[in-house]
Every structure is written in structure tokens, then in C-alpha cells.
Amino acid sequence: MVERKASVERNTLETQVKCSINLDGSGKARFDIGVPFLEHMLDQIARHGLIDLDIECKGDLHIDDHHTVEDVGITLGQAFAQAIGDKKGIFRYGHAYVPLDEALSRVVIDFSGRPGLQMHVPYTRATVGGFDVDLFQEFFQGFVNHALVTLHIDNLRGHNTHHQIETVFKAFGRALRMAVTQDERMAGQMPSTKGCL
């Protein structure tokens, strides 16, 4: 099987991001981003997606977390697009429901080649540990725009904002894992009647 790995660097006047991924990993993760809550959530993607992730970012955190969070999402999306290749033989679609105590979230993804995000998370607080939770919309928008995926995120219930977010990221990791898995019966075939994605 061809290795499905990618390393991407993205440099702007606001951030310098390096991202390496292995879609067929074991969930190993290393982060040096400077935003602890974001790193905690990225760890959920790696662990539950069985994707090896290594991300470094030097960003303008003296202003706020916005550029760093968005640009990490963009760079991760670019890395996914590169690692997934021509998409032949993958399941393409992935979905997961994940609970954490009172919280329950659903994530559905399609490696369609068409970027689109529907994110419905009724946060009960504006911040968690000083982190502006609205920035996760920017993270996922950056990801879908550059991974070229359609992504539906719904927090179905929950009143602890940390739990709401953590269930979203765990479900995202598990949906990714399902979608990028190689289907032996589809070996060498494009998972689309169009013949391309």
C-alpha cells in the first residue's frame, strides 16, 4: 500500500505552520502551537482517528488566538488533501456519534472535493480556560476549504462547553478514520459514479 503521509509548511506575516500527518498511523501526536486547549482537541483527532499528527505553529498570539487557530486548520486541511491522494479505494464517507457525560455530538464527513461546512454547536459559555470557543468555527472552515470536504457538525445536547467541544473533536476524529479507510472491495476504484472527486 502506498504511504499516505504528507508534510506541509504555510508561512504568512501572521503565522508559520508546519504540519506532518500519517493517515495510517497509530494516533501518535506532538504539538507545539502555544494554544493548550487547541492542542488538547487536536490530540482527540489523532487518538480517535488513528492519525499521526505533528504540528508546530509560531503565531501572533500577542494579539489573540484567531490567526493561529484558523491557520492550523488551513494547514491541516492542506496536509489531508495531499495525503489522501486521488481518493481511489477509500470509503469516502464517515460519521460518528460520541457522548461525554451529558454531551452528545454527531459529525458526518464526505471527501467530495466540494468544501462545505454546517456547524451547529450551541455553546453554553463563550470561553473555556480563556479560549474563545467561536474560533473552532474558523478552524473547521479553514480545514474544509483546503481538505475539500463537506462537513456537518452537530452538538445534539450538552451544557458543559468543554464536553460539547470534546465530543465534537472525538467524533470528527472517528468520522475521519472511517472516511479515509481503504475499502478492499473498492481497490483502485473511485468512490463516485462520476469517476472523479
UniProtKB/Swiss-Prot annotation:
Compartments where located? Cytoplasm
| Any one Pfam family match given in the protein's UniProt record, by short name | IGPD
Q: Give an example GO molecular function.
A: imidazoleglycerol-phosphate dehydratase activity
Which keywords annotate this record?
Amino-acid biosynthesis, Cytoplasm, Histidine biosynthesis, Lyase
Pathway(s) = Amino-acid biosynthesis; L-histidine biosynthesis; L-histidine from 5-phospho-alpha-D-ribose 1-diphosphate: step 6/9
Assigned GO CC terms: cytoplasm
Output the GO biological process annotations, alphabetical, semicolon-separated. L-histidine biosynthetic process
In terms of HAMAP family, this protein maps to:
HisB (MF_00076)
Q: Which family does it belong to?
A: Belongs to the imidazoleglycerol-phosphate dehydratase family.
Q: What is this protein called?
A: Imidazoleglycerol-phosphate dehydratase
Q: Gene that codes for this?
A: hisB
